[in-house]
C-alpha cells in the first residue's frame, strides 16, 4: 500500500501546511474510488522490491544508484523482474545497481536543454505538473532543490516513482501525488513551477497557465515546455482527430503566440529559451517500452511531417515570472 503520511508530516511543518486542509481527503477519495485495474499488481512490485541505500548516488548528472560491491546475479534478476512488471517505462533513464532502464524518452536531454535557463534551484520548493515517473524530480533534487513535489494522475507513474524511491534509500526530498492540476487549491507556495509536455493536452490552455500561476509565490518562476509550430504570434495549430497518433492534443501554438499567452495571463519577463525538433533518438522504442514510438508517428516518406500531415513535433521552453 502506497502511503502519503510522510509527505503530510513534512508539509505540516512548512509553508505548504495549508494544503492539508484539502489534500488528505482527496488522497483518501482516490484510494477508495479511482484505482486502475492493474494497480494492485503494480503496487505489489513496489512492496516486494527491497529498500536499498546507495553507496554512491548521483542525481546531478543522471539518476544513478550504485552499491559498494556488485549485487549477486539473483539480486539483480529480482530487481530487474520487478521493474519490468512496471513497463512501459516512458521517462528516464535510470541506472539502479546495474539495472539500466532505457526509457522511451531521453528525459535527461530535455533536462540538459532546460537547466541552463533556470534560476538557481538551490533551496527551492518546486512543483512539477504532469511529472510522469518523476525522473525530473530527482534531477531537481540533484540541482539543489529543498523539496520537489510532482503531480500526475497516472497510477503507473506513481508506482514507478515509488519503486525508484525505494532504490534510492527511501529519499524523502521528492514526492509524487496522484492528482491533476485542477485538484490543487491556489497554494501560492512554490518558488518554481514546471509544466513540461502538458499544455497541448489541455482543452483550455490559458486556464492551465492561470492554474500554474496560482501555485507560484510572488516573484516565482514558471518553466513551460510544450509542443510548438513555426509561425508568428497569431499562429496556432488546432489538429483534427489526432496529432502524431495522439487523440488528446487540442492547441499547438507557435513560440511567439505562447509568449503572448503568458503575458496575457499576467506573467512578466517572458522569454523563449529553446526551440528544437524532437528526434527519433530522443523518443524511441526500447526493451523497456516495446510499443509504437515517434518513428511510427512520422510520415515514412517525409519525416518533417506526422502521419496525419501536420508539422513533425518540435518543442519549446519558455521561462516566465509571476510579478
From Swiss-Prot:
Broad enzyme group: transferase
Residues engaged in binding carboxy-S-adenosyl-L-methionine: 91, 105, 110, 130, 152-154, 181-182, 196, 200, 315
Any Pfam family: Methyltransf_9
InterPro entries: CmoB, Mo5U34_MeTrfas-like, SAM-dependent_MTases_sf
Molecular function as annotated in GO: methyltransferase activity; transferase activity, transferring alkyl or aryl (other than methyl) groups
Record keyword Nucleotide-binding present: no
Transferase keyword on record: yes
Reaction equations catalysed: carboxy-S-adenosyl-L-methionine + 5-hydroxyuridine(34) in tRNA = 5-carboxymethoxyuridine(34) in tRNA + S-adenosyl-L-homocysteine + H(+)
GO biological process, one term: tRNA wobble uridine modification
Gene3D superfamilies assigned to the protein according to its UniProt record, in alphabetical order: Vaccinia Virus protein VP39
UniProt-listed Enzyme Commission number(s): 2.5.1.-
Keywords, alphabetical: Transferase, tRNA processing
PANTHER family: METHYLTRANSFERASE (PTHR43464), TRNA U34 CARBOXYMETHYLTRANSFERASE (PTHR43464:SF95)
NCBIfam families, alphabetized: PRK15068.1 (NF011650), tRNA 5-methoxyuridine(34)/uridine 5-oxyacetic acid(34) synthase CmoB (TIGR00452)
Subunit text: Homotetramer.
Record family assignment: Belongs to the class I-like SAM-binding methyltransferase superfamily. CmoB family.
Purpose of the protein: Catalyzes carboxymethyl transfer from carboxy-S-adenosyl-L-methionine (Cx-SAM) to 5-hydroxyuridine (ho5U) to form 5-carboxymethoxyuridine (cmo5U) at position 34 in tRNAs.
Protein name (database record): tRNA U34 carboxymethyltransferase
Amino acid at each position: 500500500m502506497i502511503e502519503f503520511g510522510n509527505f503530510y508530516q513534512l508539509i505540516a511543518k512548512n509553508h505548504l501546511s495549508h494544503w492539508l486542509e484539502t489534500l488528505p481527503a482527496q488522497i483518501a477519495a482516490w484510494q477508495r474510488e479511482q484505482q486502475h485495474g492493474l494497480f494492485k499488481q503494480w503496487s505489489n512490485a513496489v512492496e516486494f522490491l527491497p529498500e536499498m541505500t546507495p553507496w554512491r548516488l548521483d542525481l546531478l548528472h543522471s539518476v544513478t544508484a550504485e552499491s559498494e560491491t556488485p549485487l549477486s546475479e539473483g539480486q539483480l534478476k529480482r530487481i530487474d523482474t520487478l521493474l519490468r512488471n512496471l513497463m512501459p517505462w516512458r521517462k528516464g533513464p535510470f541506472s539502479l545497481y546495474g539495472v539500466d532502464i532505457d526509457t522511451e524518452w531521453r528525459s535527461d536531454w530535455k533536462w540538459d536543454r532546460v537547466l541552463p535557463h533556470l534560476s538557481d534551484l538551490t533551496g527551492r520548493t518546486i512543483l512539477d505538473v504532469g511529472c510522469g515517473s518523476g525522473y525530473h524530480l530527482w534531477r531537481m533534487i540533484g540541482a539543489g532543490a529543498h523539496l520537489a513535489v510532482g503531480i500526475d494522475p497516472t497510477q503507473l507513474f506513481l508506482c514507478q516513482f515509488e519503486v525508484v524511491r525505494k532504490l534510492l534509500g527511501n529519499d524523502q526530498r521528492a514526492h509524487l501525488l496522484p492528482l491533476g492540476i485542477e485538484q490543487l487549491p491556489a497554494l501560492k507556495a512554490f518558488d518554481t513551477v514546471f509544466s513540461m509536455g502538458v499544455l497541448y493536452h489541455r482543452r483550455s490552455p490559458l486556464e492551465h497557465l492561470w492554474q500554474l500561476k496560482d501555485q507560484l509565490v510572488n516573484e516565482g518562476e514558471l518553466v513551460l515546455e510544450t509542443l510548438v509550430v513555426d509561425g508568428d504570434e497569431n499562429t496556432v495549430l488546432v489538429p483534427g482527430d489526432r496529432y502524431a497518433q495522439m487523440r488528446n492534443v487540442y492547441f499547438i501554438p507557435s513560440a511567439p503566440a505562447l509568449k503572448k499567452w503568458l503575458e496575457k495571463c499576467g506573467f512578466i519577463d517572458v522569454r523563449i529559451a529553446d526551440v528544437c525538433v524532437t528526434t527519433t533518438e530522443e523518443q524511441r522504442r526500447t526493451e523497456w517500452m516495446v510499443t509504437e514510438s515517434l518513428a511510427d508517428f512520422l510520415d515514412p516518406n517525409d519525416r518533417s511531417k506526422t502521419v496525419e500531415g501536420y508539422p513533425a513535433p518540435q518543442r519549446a521552453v519558455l521561462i516566465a515570472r509571476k510579478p
